[in-house]
């Protein structure tokens, strides 16, 4: 219903970051929901939270994108995009101090990937100096529902590299693994996966929404996490992992949280941080705890695992503490890492892309919507560049090697 039922003043102190206050104390989320088919919107509207959204903020088409990136980006999506931008503009004009935009989308289908990246590039044109953070769900072969996912994902990454400021990389495979292994769920549903994603999103954004001892926002996060502009794809982890509707058995200590959040099993994307090195990382703790203990633990982590952090960026792990824990937990922690091991995911998608593209499989669905093969080639080479950039910085050391010295002589 959009009314606040708690009794904590701090919860309401910055409620206007994500909500507009309407008459009689109702809060309306500043969210725009878009899709190219009406079905999903109908299920949101008839669901438990359907009534809290502003009805005008549902923007949908009738035809669907049929898992086709070109339909989302060039044909169907292009027809709908202006009505979406009108709503976005209206919401942006209501803001006192607009910091940026958050886009949640998947990269495997047609709408989230094609139209999602179209929306991002349009917002980029209109608000060039605002932050653009995305929560992007990458496709994975183990949990696949369309054969053309690698095409859609590669074309999307090509856009995200250029137009997004920070991408939180999520992955259905990793989310399923967490449900199976850690939460011991036998048949996880999308509801369970979304529960994990929402816990992570809540953690990433808690500094924007609540007062805390060490405050950070989207821009500070970007400044601390992105050493090179193209390398803005982050792995996210969360601790403690709980399943929907479960009660937590005992409160974790700060050392346990620190241990868990960096564990590969707690990462929301299917890449193993131990196979690469962290360029930068950030940890956001929530709950009543001593900032001193958090700092000590973080230093401890860096000292014990120094080989997993690049040595040419000193102090590359930042931590922040927010006093208000998530609902149902005493303490929690969200971890965001800019790790070179994320290239495993890009490699995986790229290899599948190349296998199909070499034989030009399924290409007619895209060229039929007016795309050119050239675009596929460009997206593929951009993905290759991204992978080799991650590899280059993974191998980089603080000491200049002989090879560099020769370059200086010539210069």
Curated annotation (Swiss-Prot):
Per the record's keyword annotation, is Nucleus included, yes or no? no
Q: Where does GTP bind?
A: 37, 106, 110-112, 172, 194
Q: Name one Pfam family in it.
A: Tubulin_C
Any one biological process term the GO annotation gives: microtubule-based process
Q: Name one GO cellular component term.
A: cytoplasm
Record's subcellular location: Cytoplasm, Cytoskeleton
Fetch the CDD domains from UniProt: beta_tubulin
Please verify whether the record's keywords include Transcription regulation: no
Q: Which UniProt keywords apply?
A: Cytoplasm, Cytoskeleton, GTP-binding, Magnesium, Metal-binding, Microtubule, Nucleotide-binding
SMART domains linked: Tubulin, Tubulin_C
Instruction: Write out the function statement from the record.
Output: Tubulin is the major constituent of microtubules, a cylinder consisting of laterally associated linear protofilaments composed of alpha- and beta-tubulin heterodimers. Microtubules grow by the addition of GTP-tubulin dimers to the microtubule end, where a stabilizing cap forms. Below the cap, tubulin dimers are in GDP-bound state, owing to GTPase activity of alpha-tubulin.
Q: Which domain of life is it from?
A: Eukaryota
Q: What is its main location?
A: cytoplasm
* InterPro entries (alphabetical): Beta_tubulin, Tub_FtsZ_C, Tubulin, Tubulin/FtsZ-like_C, Tubulin/FtsZ_2-layer-sand-dom, Tubulin/FtsZ_GTPase_sf, Tubulin_C, Tubulin_CS
Under what name is this protein listed?
Tubulin beta-2 chain
- The record lists Mg(2+) as bound by 37
Q: Region annotation Disordered: residue ranges?
A: 392-411
**Which GO molecular function entries does the Swiss-Prot or TrEMBL record give?**
GTP binding; GTPase activity; metal ion binding; structural constituent of cytoskeleton
State whether it acts alone or in a complex, and with which partners, per the record.
Dimer of alpha and beta chains. A typical microtubule is a hollow water-filled tube with an outer diameter of 25 nm and an inner diameter of 15 nM. Alpha-beta heterodimers associate head-to-tail to form protofilaments running lengthwise along the microtubule wall with the beta-tubulin subunit facing the microtubule plus end conferring a structural polarity. Microtubules usually have 13 protofilaments but different protofilament numbers can be found in some organisms and specialized cells.
Q: Which family does it belong to?
A: Belongs to the tubulin family.
Required co-factors: Mg(2+)
- For bias kind Acidic residues, which ranges apply? 402-411
